[in-house]
C-alpha cells in the first residue's frame, strides 16, 4: 500500500475501528477525518457500483474500468473498501458480524431505512452496547421534515444560507463548495470523538443524530444572532459584511482584492498607509459602529483610493502596515501557492498510480494528521477486514 505520510505521524485514534456505510460527502468526510486521526475505517459499498461519487466525473484519475472520479478521492483517504449488499440476508449477517468488533458506525440512509434490515441503532447496540452509531440525514431523526431526503444545495436554500449569499438585490447564490455537507461531517466527527471519550467512563455507546439542516442553521452564526437579537432580517450584501466596515472586496487598478479591517486600530493604519489619516480621525468613521452606520459614504471613498494602485502594490503597502488584506486567487493559483507548499498541504507521490491530494489541515507537534492509505478501489481491503 502506497504511503502518503510518515509512519511516525500521530495516530491518536489507533485501535478504533469505524464502519463507514455512508455515501457522497458528509458521512465520508467524517470517516476520512477519523482515518486521518488513526482509526481503522472500513468503507462498506454497494457490490459492483460502490459510492455514487466514484462516477461523479470528469475529471478522472486512472483509465478504463479502474478510473475513479476526483470527487471520490477528496473524501475517502485512509479507508479500506468492502462490498456488501445490505438488503440481502448474507449482507445483513456480515454487517452484524463487523459491528461486534466495531467502535463507530456512520450511516446516511433515510430515516427508518436501515431498521427494515435490523441495522438501526437500537438493534446493533444490542449486539454491541459500546457501539457509537452516527446517523447523518438532511433533516434529522425527528421533526416534520425528517422523512425528506436532504442534499447540500437544498439545505443551503432552506436553512437560510442562500438568503444571505449573493449580490445585494440580486438572485440568491449557493456557496462554491458543499459547505453544509462538509461542516456536517466536521460536527459529526466532533460528536463521535466526544462519545468515544465519554465511553471510557460509561462503557456505553451513543446514537448521534447529525442533521444537515441543524448544522446549517448553526452555521448562520452572527447572522442568526443578528436576527434573534435585533430582528435585522439579514439579506444579501454581496461581499460586504453586516457588522464590520470596511470588510469586503474592492476594485484595484488591475483587478480586485479583499480588505478585511477588523478593528479601529487597523482602520487607522489603513488610512495612514493610504495617505488619508484625517478620515480615521473623523467621528463619522473613527469607530466600527460609526463606519457601519455611514458605510454608504465611506465605501465609495475607499473605492476611489483603492483604484489608484495595483493589487500587488496595495498588498505590499498594507502588509507592512499590518492591515489584513488578500489578493483573490483562483483554485489553480492556490494549488501552487508557496505557502501551501511550505505547509505541506499538497500531497504528491513518486508513484504515478497515486493521485495528488490535499492533506488533513491539522498538525500535532509539527506533523500532519494524514493517513498513509490512498482512497481505495472497490473491495480493496476485504481480505484484511
Regions found by a protein language model. Name each.
Residues 48, 139-140, 212-217, 254, ...:
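Glycine-rich beta-alpha junction loops
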Residues 185-206, 218-229, 271-278:
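Oxidoreductase and adenylate-handling cofactor-binding alpha/beta cores
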Residues 141, 169-178, 200-216, 235-242, ...:
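Conserved Rossmann-fold dehydrogenase catalytic segment
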Residues 283, 319-343:
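Conserved PLP cofactor-binding pocket of PLP-dependent enzymes
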Residues 1-201, 349, 377, 381-382:
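N-terminal helix-loop segment corresponding to the beta1-alpha1 unit
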Amino acid at each position: 500500500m502506497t504511503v502518503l505520510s510518515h509512519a511516525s505521524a500521530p495516530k491518536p485514534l489507533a485501535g478504533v475501528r469505524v464502519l463507514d456505510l455512508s455515501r457522497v460527502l458528509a458521512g465520508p468526510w467524517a470517516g476520512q477525518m477519523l482515518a486521518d486521526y488513526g482509526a481503522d475505517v472500513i468503507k462498506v459499498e454497494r457490490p459492483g457500483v460502490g459510492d455514487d461519487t466514484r462516477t461523479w466525473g470528469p475529471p478522472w484519475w486512472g483509465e478504463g474500468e479502474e478510473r475513479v472520479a476526483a470527487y471520490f478521492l477528496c473524501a475517502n483517504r485512509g479507508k479500506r473498501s468492502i462490498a456488501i449488499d445490505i438488503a440481502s440476508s448474507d449482507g445483513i449477517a456480515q454487517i452484524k458480524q463487523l459491528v461486534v468488533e466495531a467502535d463507530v458506525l456512520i450511516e446516511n440512509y433515510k430515516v427508518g431505512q436501515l431498521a427494515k434490515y435490523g441495522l438501526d441503532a437500537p438493534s446493533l447496540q444490542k449486539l454491541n452496547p459500546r457501539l457509537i452509531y452516527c446517523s447523518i440525514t438532511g433533516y434529522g431523526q425527528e421533526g416534520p421534515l425528517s422523512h425528506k431526503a436532504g442534499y447540500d444545495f437544498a439545505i443551503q436554500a432552506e436553512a437560510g444560507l442562500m438568503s444571505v449569499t449573493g449580490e445585494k438585490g440580486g438572485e440568491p447564490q449557493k456557496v462554491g463548495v458543499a459547505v453544509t455537507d462538509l461542516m456536517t461531517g466536521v460536527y459529526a466527527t466532533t460528536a463521535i470523538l466526544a462519545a468515544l471519550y465519554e465511553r471510557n467512563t460509561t462503557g456505553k455507546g451513543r446514537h448521534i443524530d447529525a442533521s444537515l439542516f441543524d448544522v446549517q442553521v448553526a452555521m448562520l452564526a452572527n447572522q442568526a444572532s443578528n436576527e434573534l437579537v435585533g430582528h435585522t432580517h439579514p439579506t444579501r450584501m454581496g461581499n460586504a459584511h453586516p457588522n464590520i466596515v470596511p470588510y469586503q472586496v474592492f476594485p484595484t487598478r488591475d483587478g480586485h482584492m479583499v480588505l478585511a479591517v477588523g478593528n479601529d486600530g487597523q482602520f487607522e493604519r489603513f488610512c495612514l498607509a493610504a495617505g488619508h489619516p484625517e478620515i480615521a480621525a473623523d467621528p463619522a468613521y473613527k469607530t466600527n459602529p460609526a463606519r457601519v452606520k455611514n458605510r454608504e459614504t465611506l465605501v465609495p471613498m475607499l473605492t476611489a483610493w483603492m483604484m489608484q494602485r495595483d493589487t500587488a502594490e496595495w498588498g505590499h503597502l498594507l502588509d507592512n502596515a499590518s492591515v489584513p488584506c488578500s489578493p483573490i486567487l483562483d483554485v489553480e493559483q492556490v494549488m501552487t501557492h508557496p505557502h501551501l507548499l511550505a505547509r505541506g498541504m499538497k500531497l504528491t507521490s513518486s508513484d504515478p498510480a497515486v493521485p495528488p491530494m490535499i492533506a488533513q489541515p491539522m498538525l500535532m507537534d509539527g506533523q500532519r494528521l494524514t493517513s498513509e492509505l490512498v482512497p481505495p478501489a472497490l473491495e480493496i481491503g476485504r481480505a484484511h477486514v
